[in-house]
Each structure stands twice: as C-alpha cells, then as structure tokens.
Amino acid sequence: MSEKIALGLGDNTDYEIVWNSAVFENLIRRHDIRVAELATDKPIASERDLVISILGFLRAGSGGERHVAASAIVEDFARHFAMKITLGGTSVRAAIAMRKLGHTSALHLVTINEHVRRLIPQDSPYVCSNTVDSSFPHLIVQFDKGMRVCAGDIDICSSRANRIIYHDDTDNVIMRLNEGFGDLITGAKVFLVSGFNAMRDEQLLVDRLASVQRMLARLPADAQV
C-alpha cells in the first residue's frame, strides 16, 4: 500500500556525545596540544586532529560539518564520552517526528544496520539501496555558551552555543538509490527530497538526479515535491 508521505533519500547513525570539559582537558594533555595549533580547517586524520578541530570551533563559537579520514576515528573518540545513539538525516528525523503525530511515511534509506532497524518507525515501509549492513557514524558535538576548557596553555570559553558534525560517510557520499522506492510512492501526496549535501562527484550527482526524476514520475500528478 502506498503511503501519503514519502521521505528520502539518505540516513545515518548519529553518535551524540555529552559535552565533558574534563575529558577534553585530559585529551589535551595526552596529545600535548598547544593553543597555536587550534584550527577549524585542518585535515582530520587522527584523534589528535579531531580534538584540535573541536577546540578550534569552541574557541570561535561556530559550528560546521567536517570530514574525517576514517570512521574508526569517530568510534574511538566517542568512547571517551557518555553518548546517545540516534538517527540522522532530514528525512528519517522527519519520519520519527511525524510518527509521534500519528502519520506514517515511506522511507528511502542508504544505510541499514541494527540501530536503523531499531530506531525507525516500525510501521513505516522502507527500501534501502544497500544490500548489506554498514555503519558510518556521524559524531555530533554540541556545546553551550560558556563551556570552558583549560589545560596546558589552552584556556578557552565558548561565546555561544553551537554544533559540529564529523563523519566519513561513504553511503551518503555515494548516495546509491533504489528505484524500487517508486513502488511505495504511487499514492503519495508529498515527497521530500534531501540528502545530497554529502556528495562530492558531479557526474555521480547528475546520475542520481536522473534516478530521482524516474522515481518522481511514479508520483500522482498533484503530488507536492
């Protein structure tokens, strides 16, 4: 049966850590990080690089999204903190919110794993473009105004609250699509298209948009996109 609401196209697992200045101060000492090294635009190839980046954002009071060299960096770093595993992606978060209001949605996913199966609305039909389980977690770092970190020659305090996202998400970079999603949306009244922001290859993006156009052709003529 076709749902009235169709949501796509990407999804991911979020590791939402609980800010802990004492942990950051220990990491500063462990990695011998100096204030002159703090920056928000350096490549992130190690835990040390990640700490430098987070502290750079904290000092600037700004937020952003950055690529890390490997998901293992995110996995290892997150273990230092209390954290909550949630789902990310505009479409999946919208589906979860609308289910609380009594509405089900058809979902297109690019990542499937135990967390996705557990956390998506259980009565919302979905297709996934991946045939095997995968995990490319997004590290979600949120800090409030006035968060202070003091260790070595570093003494910084955030001027405002903000949020930073770090990941190496192959599934969302490639954004493989499953055109079988068209079978779930033939009666949809609205189709939310999102998730292309992680893509880097122009020709691959062109190919994916052509796939989206073919899926859109399965919608009723009066559907909103």
Q: Where do the model's predicted regions map?
A:
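Ribokinase/PfkB-type carbohydrate-kinase core domain
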Residues: 1-225
